[in-house]
Amino acid sequence: MLHTIKPVANARKTTKRLGRGPGSGTGKTSGKGHKGQLARSGKTLRPGFEGGQIPFFQRIPKRGFHNFAQKKYAVLNLTTLQNFPEDSVITPQLLLEKKIIKDPLSGIKVLGQGTLTKKLVVKASKFSRQAEASILAVGGKIEVI
């Protein structure tokens, strides 16, 4: 039974035998052509190499710049604020202690994802309109620091 099992047709591709005479179709130069860089051993050309000519990616002009004065804010959503007890004061120091944010970056921005049902005092650098409305609607306070 086991000795009769064969793989599905064309499932196992036979390897191309190189340099085995002119009758094989890949004799003599083994499909590498005559001389030149690509015929040598260890032929590895990096992607985009154009034979010494200035490559396309270097010919096109550079665009844009990196703004070093850009401010990045740590994001805090209402779903996270919902986990705090009622009437608690949420500050960047508290968020760092509880490991809710790893790095305050340029400050903290509170976003409006989720719902808030608890009255809280939130101190942060920025608030989205939706987050601000949600905190105030429940009777909480907002302080921009």
UniProtKB/Swiss-Prot annotation:
UniProt cross-references to InterPro entries, sorted A to Z: Ribosomal_uL15 (IPR030878), Ribosomal_uL15/eL18 (IPR021131), Ribosomal_uL15/eL18_sf (IPR036227), Ribosomal_uL15_bac-type (IPR005749), Ribosomal_uL15_CS (IPR001196)
Tagged with keyword Ribonucleoprotein: yes
Highest rank taxon of the organism: Bacteria
Pfam families on file: Ribosomal_L27A
Residues covered by region (Disordered): 1-50
Residues spanning the signal sequence: none
A single BP term in Gene Ontology: translation
One CC-aspect GO term: cytosolic large ribosomal subunit
PROSITE patterns xref list: RIBOSOMAL_L15
Tagged with keyword Cell division: no
Compositionally biased spans, kind Gly residues: 20-30
UniProt keyword annotations, A-Z: Ribonucleoprotein, Ribosomal protein, RNA-binding, rRNA-binding
Disulfide bond annotation, renumbered to this chain: none
GO MF, one annotated term: structural constituent of ribosome
HAMAP family xrefs: Ribosomal_uL15 (MF_01341)
Function: Binds to the 23S rRNA.
Family affiliation: Belongs to the universal ribosomal protein uL15 family.
Self-association and partners: Part of the 50S ribosomal subunit.
Protein name as catalogued: Large ribosomal subunit protein uL15
Lineage: Bacteria, Bacillati, Mycoplasmatota, Mollicutes, Acholeplasmatales
